[in-house]
């Protein structure tokens, strides 16, 4: 087992900004002899299985209070110590947490991505690099519509309603202000390979 402490990279930004794509691109460039994992913050949505489907649809999933922060902090702290963690699995279609989990242990690079990835002081303190993805809001909306309709069993109308009522306001109130915690802000699109190269070079140099 590698005795060196794992590298924790946090990637934040608006819904639909390209956080997951950016995280995947980073991990794809990590050398094969270096173990890595991507953990999605959405896994830590509070389980609301006691509510019916209509009640769950009324929840503001874009507010910080929708996440189980204590578990999130505990597990990220443990994986930084190379301890085994059991990451919850959140089902977007049913909007509840599943009974099964994903076991993760002893990895060299942890990439944690989510809208509030750099929002929490405790998590920020144990992170090695904090990245904020900046993408125009109209592009984020287009990506979210395509994703939620095609992958999450949502209607076009419901996506637009949620964007106007919670996604955009919560971004302005909570997500965008967290940008001040970032070490790096990235203007992200599929052509911005320079940012990927620089971040991966940094990871490889300190690992």
From Swiss-Prot:
ATP binds at residues 13-20. It is found in: Cytoplasm. GO terms for cellular component: cytoplasm. Pathway: Pyrimidine metabolism; CTP biosynthesis via salvage pathway; CTP from cytidine: step 1/3; Pyrimidine metabolism; UMP biosynthesis via salvage pathway; UMP from uridine: step 1/1. GO terms for biological process: CTP salvage; UMP salvage. Keywords: ATP-binding, Cytoplasm, Kinase, Nucleotide-binding, Transferase. The keyword Metal-binding does not apply. Its main location: cytoplasm. It catalyses: uridine + ATP = UMP + ADP + H(+); cytidine + ATP = CMP + ADP + H(+). Its EC number is 2.7.1.48. GO terms for molecular function: ATP binding; cytidine kinase activity; uridine kinase activity. The keyword ATP-binding applies. It comes from the Bacteria. Belongs to the uridine kinase family. This is Uridine kinase. The lineage of its organism: Bacteria, Bacillati, Mycoplasmatota, Mycoplasmoidales, Mycoplasmoidaceae.
């Amino acid at each position: 087992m590698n005795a060196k402490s794992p590298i924790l990279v946090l990637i934040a930004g608006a819904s639909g900004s390209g956080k997951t794509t950016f995280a995947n691109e980073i991990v794809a460039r990590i050398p094969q002899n270096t173990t890595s994992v991507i953990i999605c913050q959405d896994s830590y949505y509070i389980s609301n299985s006691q509510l019916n489907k209509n009640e769950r649809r009324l929840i503001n999933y874009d507010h910080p209070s929708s996440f189980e922060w204590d578990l999130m902090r505990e597990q990220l702290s443990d994986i930084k110590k190379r301890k085994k963690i059991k990451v919850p699995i959140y089902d977007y279609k049913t909007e509840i947490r599943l009974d099964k989990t994903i076991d993760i242990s002893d990895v060299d690079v942890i990439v944690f991505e989510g809208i509030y990835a750099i929002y929490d002081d405790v998590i920020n303190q144990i992170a090695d690099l904090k990245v904020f993805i900046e993408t125009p809001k109209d592009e984020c909306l287009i990506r979210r519509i395509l994703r939620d309709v095609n992958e999450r069993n949502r209607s076009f109308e419901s996506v637009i309603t949620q964007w106007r009522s919670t996604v955009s306001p919560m971004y302005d109130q909570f997500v965008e202000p967290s940008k001040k915690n970032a070490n790096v802000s990235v203007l992200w699109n599929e052509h911005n390979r320079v940012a990927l190269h620089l971040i991966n070079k940094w990871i490889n140099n300190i690992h």
